[in-house]
C-alpha cells in the first residue's frame, strides 16, 4: 500500500509564506525546521515513486503473462477449429454412408410392404369368398324361416278364426240364455201378480160379505132389543094408564116424542156406528193389505231391479266382449309387429356379428402378419448392422454414437410392436365381449344358441393372455 502524504500542497510548490512568515524573515531555527520538513517530504515522495515503480513493473509482468496465455489459448482454439473441421468431414462421410444404408433399407421395406399388400389381397379374396358362401347359406336359412313363419301365421289365423267362431257361438248362447231367463222371470212375476190380484179381490169380497152379514146381525139384534124395550115401556105405560089417563096421555105424547127422538138418535147412532165400523175395520184391513202389498210390491220392485241389473250386466258383458274383441285384434297386430321387429333385429344382429367377426379375424391376421414381418425385418437389420460395424472399423467414439442411435431406433420399433400387440389384444377382447353380449341377447329373446346356424369363433393371440375386464380396459399383453 502506498504511504500517505503529510503536509499541505502549498508547501510543496513553494514557500513564499511559511507558517505566516516570509523566508527572509525566518530565524535560523525556523529555517532548519523548514528544511527538515522538506527533506521528510522528499523522502516520502521517493518512497512513493519507488512503490509506484514496483507496481508498474508488477502490472507489466502480469500483462506479459496474460498475453502469452492469450496466444496459447488462440493456438489451442485454432487447433480445436482444425479438429472440428476434421470431425465435420468425418461426420459428413458417415452421414453419406448411413444415407446409402437407409436407401437400401427403404428399398427392402418397400419390397416387404408390397409382399404384405399382396398377401393381404389374397387373404381379402379368401375372406370375401367365404363371406359369399356364408351369405348364401344365411339367405337359404332366411327363406326357410320365412316359409316357416308364413305357415305359422296361417296356423295362427286358423286358430284365431276358430276362436272367433267359438266366441261368437258362446256369445249367442249366453244372449239366448239371458233372454230366456228374462222371459221366464217376466212370465213368473206376471203370473204371481195376477194370482196376487185375484187373491186380494177374493179376500176383499169375502171380508165385505162377512162385514155385511155381521152388521146385519147387529142391526137385527138391536132392533129386537128396541122392540123388547118398547114392549116393556108399553106395558109399563098401560099399567100407568090404568091409574092416570091424563098422565098416560101426557106421557104418551112425551113417549112418542122421546121414541121419535130415540129412533132418530138410534138410527143416527146405528148409521154412525155402522159407518165407523164399516170404515174402521176395512181401514185396518186395508192398512194390513197395504203393508202386505207394499212388501210384495217391494219384492216385485226388487225383482224388477234384479232384472234391470241383469240386463245392465248383460249390456256391460256385451260391451266388455266387444272391447275384448277389439283388444284381441290390437294384440294380434302388435304380436305380428313384434314378431317382424324380432326377425328384423335377429337378422341385423346376426349380420353385425358376422361382419364384426370377419373384420376382427381379418384384422388379427393382418396384425399378426405385420408383427411377424416387423420381427423378421428387425432381425435382418440387426444382422446387417453388425456386418456394417464389422466392416467399417469405426473408432470407439463414433461406434458408441452409432450404437446409441441404433438403440433409440430399436426402442422406438419395440414400442411400435408393443402398441400393435396391445391393439391386437384389445380387438380380440372386444370381439370376445361382443360374442358374450350376443349370446346373452339371444338367451334374453328366447333363441337357443344351437339355432343360430353358425358357431361363433373366439379369437386369441398365440402366446398371450388377455385381460378379463371390459374391452376398453385391456391390460398390456403378457
UniProtKB/Swiss-Prot annotation:
Pfam families: GAS
UniProt-annotated stretches for the region Microtubule-binding: 115-258
Biased composition range(s): Basic residues: 1-12
Recorded GO CC terms: 9+2 motile cilium; axoneme; ciliary basal body; cilium; cytoplasm; extracellular region; glial cell projection; Golgi apparatus
Location within or outside the cell: Cytoplasm; Cytoplasm, Cytoskeleton; Cell projection, Cilium, Flagellum; Cytoplasm, Cytoskeleton, Cilium axoneme
Chief localization: cytoplasm
Stretch list, region Regulates microtubule-binding: 1-114
Ranges in a coiled coil: 24-201, 243-427
Chain spans, region Interaction with SMO: 357-478
GO biological process: axoneme assembly; brain development; cilium movement involved in cell motility; determination of left/right symmetry; epithelial cilium movement involved in extracellular fluid movement; establishment of localization in cell; flagellated sperm motility; positive regulation of protein localization to cilium
Residues covered by region (Disordered): 1-32
GO MF annotation: an example: microtubule binding
Domain of life, per lineage: Eukaryota
Keywords, comma-separated and alphabetical: Cell projection, Cilium, Coiled coil, Cytoplasm, Cytoskeleton, Flagellum, Golgi apparatus, Microtubule
Family designation: Belongs to the DRC4 family.
PANTHER family xref list: DYNEIN REGULATORY COMPLEX SUBUNIT 4 (PTHR31543:SF0)
Function according to Swiss-Prot or TrEMBL: Component of the nexin-dynein regulatory complex (N-DRC), a key regulator of ciliary/flagellar motility which maintains the alignment and integrity of the distal axoneme and regulates microtubule sliding in motile axonemes. Plays an important role in the assembly of the N-DRC linker. Plays dual roles at both the primary (or non-motile) cilia to regulate hedgehog signaling and in motile cilia to coordinate cilia movement. Required for proper motile cilia functioning.
Record note on quaternary structure: Component of the nexin-dynein regulatory complex (N-DRC). Interacts with microtubules. Interacts with SMO. Interacts (via coiled-coil domains) with RAB3B (in GTP-bound form). Interacts with DRC1. Interacts with DRC7.
Record's protein name: Dynein regulatory complex subunit 4
Species this protein is from: Rattus norvegicus
